[in-house]
Amino acid sequence: MRKIIHVDMDCFFAAVEMRDNPALRDIPIAIGGSRERRGVISTANYPARKFGVRSAMPTGMALKLCPHLTLLPGRFDAYKEASNHIREIFSRYTSRIEPLSLDEAYLDVTDSVHCHGSATLIAQEIRQTIFSELQLTASAGVAPVKFLAKIASDMNKPNGQFVITPAEVPAFLQTLPLAKIPGVGKVSAAKLEAMGLRTCGDVQKCDLVILLKRFGKFGRILWERSQGIDERDVNSERLRKSVGVERTMAEDIHHWSECEAIIERLYPELERRLAKVKPDLLIARQGVKLKFDDFQQTTQEHVWPRLNKADLIATARKTWDERRGGRGVRLVGLHVTLLDPQMERQLVLGL
């Protein structure tokens, strides 16, 4: 029996904004395009959701529901950065990772030896690690198949998890509304209800032939899901493109010696993480990131063939001297970009 975890970050874009600017934490905020440009909401925090603001809602409607809504344009580099860090955390537990978007993924931990092989404990530890390292919360679902893991991750949001053991699947399905199954939209749900089908238990009693005539291929999928059948594998994560490590300080730093000391502490962790995916430590580029007390950030990198601490320190010093402008620094990060597989093959052939 497989052990599948679905991890879903809680209002991810908004959560990153609130983490980086605590003044936003207790007020309604949303990420989206402006009303003038007929934008839509990407996500909203929980204070905004209390007013009915939702993802994919037109910005104009959101502002009518919540006139004091703080609308943010979004910082997708920051979201991508956090997403990459989260996926790196996943990789500590399994190589079988299927990202669905920046803020959610499936993990197959069937063969994982972590936490004595307990998927429940692995999910809990992953969520704790995400919060410890990124100050972001995640929800998780654990089940023997993918669609149930995804449904389960929504059961105890935010910052919770829900487990459906193999023994619990039949009872869980009996009362599960069909609208909860991924892929069943409002139109399909209405058609099913017109047939007297509201739950998976109802579909279990329905003849498959009827479902096939009414819904075609989707009818079979619906019938299988209602039986708890989902044979889809977790598709492994695409080849990793970068590895990074960073630290947000409790208090801003103002002296180069403090920054250098942080790099000295970060470097061994970067080396450890890189060695897990590239034991030879060969890379395409390496660089540093500084985030300042006004939440602006700068990244500087250049081509370098192998992870090198002295070069990272020199790059950081140059960045510190040229771009800080007297500002305090709240975050220091180190990262490397991995060689493209085709480029790596060419280098090997060249040798």
Swiss-Prot record:
Gene Ontology BP, a term: DNA-templated DNA replication
UniProt-annotated catalytic positions: E104
GO CC annotations, alphabetized: cytosol
Binding site for Mg(2+): D8, D103
Gene3D superfamilies in UniProt: 3.30.70.270, 3.40.1170.60, 5' to 3' exonuclease, C-terminal subdomain, DNA polymerase, Y-family, little finger domain
EC number: 2.7.7.7
Catalytic activity: DNA(n) + a 2'-deoxyribonucleoside 5'-triphosphate = DNA(n+1) + diphosphate
Cofactor: Mg(2+)
Disulphides: none
Organism domain of life: Bacteria
Principal subcellular localisation of the protein: cytoplasm
Site for Substrate discrimination, residues: F13
Subunit note: Monomer.
Similarity annotation: Belongs to the DNA polymerase type-Y family.
Function: Poorly processive, error-prone DNA polymerase involved in untargeted mutagenesis. Copies undamaged DNA at stalled replication forks, which arise in vivo from mismatched or misaligned primer ends. These misaligned primers can be extended by PolIV. Exhibits no 3'-5' exonuclease (proofreading) activity. May be involved in translesional synthesis, in conjunction with the beta clamp from PolIII.
Name of the protein in question: DNA polymerase IV
Lineage: Bacteria, Pseudomonadati, Pseudomonadota, Gammaproteobacteria, Enterobacterales
